[in-house]
Amino acid sequence: AYNFCPNPINFMHIANLSSHVIDSVAYVEGVIEELKKIKTVWEPPGKATVSGFQSLMSMNLLKNPSGKLAQLKSIIINEIEVYYLKFQNEQCSYIQKFPTTRNLFGWTVILKQQGHQNAHIHSSGWLSGVIYLKVVPPLGKDEGAIGFSLNSEYYHDVNSPSLTFQPEVGDIVFFPS
């Protein structure tokens, strides 16, 4: 049997910026201010963003960051190490062949009313993540939540595992790409 990542939902990891910075509220506000300077596009073609803005994919926000974004890159690298250590004893190729080189690619998404991300994968990545700088209050219908499932446009199984996570400001959510 192929044993790359038998149950990807089991490899989710949730942390928060508050475990990396003293004043996470001020830090998040600073990151948001820096991101306001980044050029974005409304509903970029071929991307998962619906009713929202996304930075240009030609611009990797983590390539040569400065200021708060440089600190954010450092936080991400540290949290990837925490992630790996958490799962290092798992007997699957996803962990046993976990890349030792940290090649990060980052972008920003700003969702507006009724905005969301369509279901998608990051086929060129190994580990993906989201850092929540702003969230909407949940009104009982999973507003602002992130969902995980093995189902897709081309595959659907009602018995397939799924998980919905309601993030809070500062949450870092890692999951297999």
Give each language-model segment a name.
Residues Y2-I95, H116:
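Non-heme Fe(II)/2-oxoglutarate
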